[in-house]
Amino acid sequence: MGIWVTGDTHGDFQRFTTRNYPQLKGMDRNDCMIIAGDFGGVWAGEQTDGRKLDWLEDKPFTTLFVCGNHENFGLLSAYPEREWHGGRVHVVRPHVLHLMRGQIFEIGGLTWFTMGGAASHDIQDGILDPAAPNFERRYWTMRRMNAMFRVLGHSWWPEEMPSEAEYAEAEANLERAGWQVNCILTHCAPSGILPQIELHYRPDPLTDFLETVRQRCRFSSWFLGHYHTNRIIDGRFVIQWGQISKVELM
């Protein structure tokens, strides 16, 4: 069994071709390809997304992902939920699984704590509500201005950030594990790491929660995406984007 981790795909899975990544040859269903958020394959509904998801299902490996901030959370939450390797998942396809927030999985002999989500940083000019009476006028005005905005329920969902119940479940599961896991998988970074990524990133409730995890939890590696860079910070925080990295198993 092997485990590989990559960063944001945003619905583009071409990195998972043997032409782009020859190491895919010889993989099987016991091998796992993990996407560190902004999966983007569940976005416009099965009629639009289905072909790409079926293509991914046909790959020889099992695809696992945590949510990022650019996901259609309404559609994602509608997929069947079940237990898998000790934690809860949404089954997008039999071998395409969403690792839900606050869970601890055992994969490849390693324990993995998962906490997807992030606060969008491309909404400086606001969130438009399609139900507002002046929506269409505001939408086209902002488009002409090249404004940084998104549309509620179409390109932005408040569920990009965890709920209080998800925070509570995460903490309870870490308590049961004695605040010790092998790996942590998130989309965004803990607050204490943000200045080392880029100075303009500001803490928020999720990054603050992850900072608590960083300080309290014993772990070997922390994998994340979100920042569109490939970097390793402090020897343990592996930021992924287009790169695919193999995880060393114990």
What are these regions (language model features)?
Residues 1-4, 103-114, 183, 234-238:
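Beta-strand-turn-beta hairpins that frame and shape the catalytic cleft
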Residues 3-5, 33-36, 183-187, 223:
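Structural motif
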Residues 6, 11-107, 199, 203-211, ...:
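Core catalytic region of metal-dependent phosphoesterases/phosphodiesterases
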Residues 9-10, 39-40, 69-72, 118-119, ...:
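Catalytic metal-binding/acid-base residues of hydrolase active sites
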Residues 13, 43, 192-195, 231:
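Short, solvent-exposed loop/turn segments at secondary-structure junctions
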Residues 108-200:
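Active-site-proximal loop/helix segment associated with metal-binding centers of metalloenzymes
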Residues 202-204, 234-249:
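Short, electropositive alpha-helical surface patch
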